[in-house]
From Swiss-Prot:
Official protein name in the record: 2-C-methyl-D-erythritol 4-phosphate cytidylyltransferase
HAMAP family: IspD (MF_00108)
Gene name as annotated: ispD
PANTHER family documented for this protein: 2-C-METHYL-D-ERYTHRITOL 4-PHOSPHATE CYTIDYLYLTRANSFERASE, CHLOROPLASTIC (PTHR32125:SF4)
Species for this entry: Psychrobacter cryohalolentis (strain ATCC BAA-1226 / DSM 17306 / VKM B-2378 / K5)
Similarity remark: Belongs to the IspD/TarI cytidylyltransferase family. IspD subfamily.
Function description: Catalyzes the formation of 4-diphosphocytidyl-2-C-methyl-D-erythritol from CTP and 2-C-methyl-D-erythritol 4-phosphate (MEP).
Length: 280
């Protein structure tokens, strides 16, 4: 992909556009409603997340990318002026739809787009401003992230049956995910368990958060590359990584957790209560 490094780095005062991706269902959360509409402290996660963006010194409106059949978002009140785009099946497809909507609305390719998860309502305002300020000085963008603090284990799947033949290698998680029939295909396997294979060096490991902030035109190009080559990505920064384009890491707060599983509600509720108490 042709680099526009020189053009982008000179534009250190770009216009800022905000996008919240809210088209997913949150299957791991397991609720009957989309998790962005979970109520905490009297408001939905989506409303909380928009309110955090509204506190930024750089954001004055927000694009919400929602599912085709979403009938809830437009019934809510938000802390920013809102406009909408229809998302796709995968997160990156929703972001791509949002980028196209922004460009069609007249945004410049050198502008910055701030992409935030609806399920991260506790991001501190100063972190939002910090990652935007960092992205202003980068040719491609910057993201919030935290250094990994816990010990990381790589795992494998195997049985505890001692009669398992030595020539049968343990099943990997990828094998089980893509070929579940293998779970019962190896002789001697009666109960499968997860085991630690090795410890991963965490000295250069970071946990990605949002907001993630990118040059709009560059993001459009890398997402087109993802589409063309049918790549699997879990966040926007990984699209840039496929092309070895540098994305700056900005240390964020550990308060900025993502609501993924039901028991995350306990921690997230406590964080929001503490944050509200500190400003009241």
């Amino acid at each position: 992909m042709e680099s526009t490094h020189e053009y982008c780095i000179m534009n250190t005062t770009p216009n800022i556009h905000a996008m919240i991706v809210a088209a997913g269902r949150g299957s791991r959360f397991g609720a009957s409603i989309a998790k962005q509409y979970t109520l905490l402290q009297g408001q939905t996660l989506l409303q909380h997340s928009v309110a955090r963006l509204a506190e930024s010194n750089y954001i004055d409106r927000c694009l919400l990318v929602v599912a085709q059949d979403d009938s809830t978002a437009q019934t809510l009140s938000f802390a920013l002026p809102i406009y909408y785009a229809i998302g796709g099946t995968e997160r990156w497809q929703s972001v791509q739809a949002g980028v196209e909507a922004m460009i069609n609305a007249g945004a410049d390719e050198s502008d910055l787009v701030v992409i935030h998860d609806a399920a991260r309502p506790a991001v501190p305002t100063h972190d939002i401003d910090a990652v935007i300020q960092a992205a202003m000085l980068e040719p491609y963008g910057a993201i919030l992230a935290t250094p990994v603090a816990d010990t990381l284990k790589q795992s494998y799947i195997a049985s505890n049956t001692l009669s398992t033949p030595a020539y049968e290698a343990p099943l990997s998680l990828q094998q089980l995910n893509t070929q579940p029939e293998l779970a019962n295909s190896q002789s001697g396997y009666d109960t499968l368990h997860t085991y630690a294979q090795k410890t991963i060096d965490r000295s250069h490991m970071w946990q990605a958060q949002t907001p993630q902030v990118f040059r709009l035109g560059q993001l459009q190009q890398v997402l087109n590359y993802v589409t063309k080559h049918n790549l699997a990505i879990t966040d926007e920064a990984s699209a840039f990584e496929h092309l070895e384009l540098p994305i700056r890491l900005v240390t964020g707060s550990r308060q900025n957790i993502k609501l993924t599983y039901p028991d995350d509600i306990i921690l997230l509720t406590a964080i929001l209560k503490a944050q509200f108490a500190s400003i009241s």
